[in-house]
C-alpha cells in the first residue's frame, strides 16, 4: 500500500484462472465475514482490483438488497455475494440474488447441491467453500465453477479435526480441475 492508502501505481495485474474467471486484476477474494463484509469493505476491495464479497448472514432480504444497492454506488467493479446456508431464513435467496443482478456467488456452510444448479442456470459463477477433500469432490460433482479451499486456520465454523490449509490445498488441487482460492492461514 502507498502512504495515502491506495495501491502502488506500478502494481501490475496478475493473470490467473481465478482472476480471468472473476474479471478482476488480482486473484484475491475478500472473505465473506459475517456481520463485517458489507458494501463498505467489499467496495474497497473491489476498487483495489480484487473481488469484494457481501455476506448474507443476517438473512434479512431487505438488508441484503440495500447492501447490494450500496455496493453499486460505491464501485463499478465486479463483486460477489456469499450465501452461508447455515443462516438462510428465506429459501428463495438464490432467486433473490439472481434478481439483484449479482454475477458471482460463493456458497458455504452447507450442501453445494442446494443452490449451484439454480445459480448456474441463471448464468452466475459459483464457488463453494470446502474444508475437506470429500467436500471438494462433492462440490465439483455438483457443478461449481471453482472452490474456496479453507483449512482450519480460517474463520467461521470449524471442526476440531480440520486440517491446515497448506495440507488441504495440495490434496484438493491434485484431484480437481477447477480454479481454487486458498483461504485460512495465508500470512506474510
Please state what every model-predicted region is.
Residues 2-181:
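Active-site entrance/lid segments in N-terminal catalytic domains of soluble metabolic enzymes
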Residues 184-188:
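A short glycine-centered flexible hinge/capping loop motif at secondary-structure junctions
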